[in-house]
Amino acid sequence: MLRMSLPSSRPLWLAALPWALAACTNVPSAPTADNSSASARPGLVRSAKAATELLAVTASMELIRFQADQPRQILQRQRIQGLAKGDTLVGIDFRVARGVLYALSQQGQLYTLHPQQGTLQAVGTGGVALPTGSFGLDFNPTVDRLRVTGPGGLNLRLHPDTGALVDGDAQQPGLQTDGRLHYATGDAYAGRQPDISAVAYTYNAQNNQLTTNYAIDKTLGTLAVQGSLEATQPQISPNTGQLHTVGPLGLGPLADVSFDISDVSNQALAAVRSLSPSAPTHLYQIDLATGRARMLGVVGDGEALLGIAIAP
């Protein structure tokens, strides 16, 4: 990837190499069992001092790149190519196990997305019909599956090699989605319909079998845990759809929000646009212990974003 004359602690060609190789090679098969306990992540060598970089999809279907400490400075802007006519992307994320950027469309088609060229390549022939609305998506690093949340409590997983729906209940005929999103009994918002439009998983460097699925409720403006915190008992799977509120972001209700957690540092970042008229998109750092958001700056010229992904 070109660094666009921005100073970096990594050589330019070395920084570009992982993405270039990932986009030009065949993706190896992932574990077929969704509850696989095998590590999905090969060893990666990275500079701990490198600035956190993000890719984002704009509402005008452009792929932009910027750094967390200077979000206003757009380092790359590329028109996204290969999307079916009338379709739009609803989110992006890097597949932790392979370092490949994935995108999901409103029509339920999964793609790989070239991080420099902005070109899409379809994965399979369409995984699932999606309702209209805002979606969250993020790869679970322990089992290499793509979590998708959306309107009406939608909660499902997609297989990254086929784009197909992962069966949420093998005991029932046909393919089932996972349990509907709902706030747990005793939660401050129990009985209220969630509006989870952003999700992200942590990465545990000491034990890669552990992860926590965090979620942001756009209507409430709150951070929640989907399932249970890693290494706590009893363990509750995100597949149940059970939500436990962490706390408010401190921003009020949101027009849109995108969310990701770094698999290097577990830094949690969210791109947020408030309900205020003509509100720009700001980048925030999220405290996973409290939910509180700390502003880092406006992203570019403040345009609306449909998804962000922290670069590996």
Residue ranges of predicted features:
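Bacterial N-terminal signal peptides that target proteins for export
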Residues: L2-W13
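C-terminal motif of bacterial Sec signal peptides marking the signal peptidase cleavage site
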Residues: L21-A23
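Sequence/structural signature of beta-propeller domains
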Residues: T25-P312
